[in-house]
Design a protein with these regions (language model features):
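Conserved beta-strand in the GNAT
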Residues: 50, 56-64, 71-76
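Conserved acetyl-CoA pyrophosphate-binding loop and the N-cap/start of the following alpha-helix
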Residues: 81, 85-93
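Helix-loop element at the rim of GNAT/NAT acetyltransferase active sites that forms part
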Residues: 9, 21-34
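Conserved GNAT acetyl-CoA-binding A-motif
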Residues: 98-110
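Conserved catalytic-core motifs of GNAT/GCN5-like acyltransferases
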Residues: 107-109, 119, 124-139
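Conserved beta-hairpin
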Residues: 35, 42-59
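A conserved beta-turn-beta hairpin within the catalytic core of GNAT-like acetyltransferases
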Residues: 65-73, 82, 132-137
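A short beta-loop-alpha structural element at the N-terminal edge
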Residues: 2-19
């Protein structure tokens, strides 16, 4: 099985440039999302994680800590590292990390076309399909 590790960083860390590059590659270049949509005010206050396989940065994500749950956002695995189980392993590590901090639920707004990936990670659809940045999304949650 593939192994990954996560590195928690903040917005002002020099390594945030990796996150910028990953978001541009995945969201702007692949999904044609406007660069203006890739970064927002939440970036200043949320938890950011780089995803590594060995010394290679393979992806990133951010977590917004809410009152009683966490919200997974902007999870992106670089194209050449997909289909290697990194995303699922990453979610398991995030659940473990935040469970130790007494959180027991994670929510996310999945791009509709990748919702089955999140289902395999234990997420359940909730609510109706909605549009964000011109792409269909669905709210999902997972208790842990």
């Amino acid at each position: 099985m593939s192994e990954i590790h996560l590195l928690k960083i903040n917005y002002n860390d020099k390594d945030f440039s990796f996150i910028q590059d990953i978001r541009k590659s995945v969201f702007k270049d692949e999904l044609q999302i406007s660069e203006a949509e890739l970064f927002d005010d939440f970036d200043n206050s949320c938890d950011h994680f780089l995803i590594f396989n060995g010394k290679n940065v393979v992806g990133s994500l951010r977590i917004i800590v809410m009152e009683d749950k966490i919200k997974l956002e902007r999870m992106a695995i670089l194209n050449e590292y997909r289909a290697k189980n990194y995303g699922k392993l990453c979610i398991l590590q995030i659940k473990e990390y935040y469970s130790a901090l007494d959180f027991s639920q994670m929510i996310l707004d999945s791009i509709y076309s990748v919702k089955d990936f999140y289902k395999k990670c234990g997420f359940i659809e909730e609510g109706d399909i909605f549009q964000r940045v011109g792409i269909d999304h669905i709210r999902m949650f997972s208790k842990f």
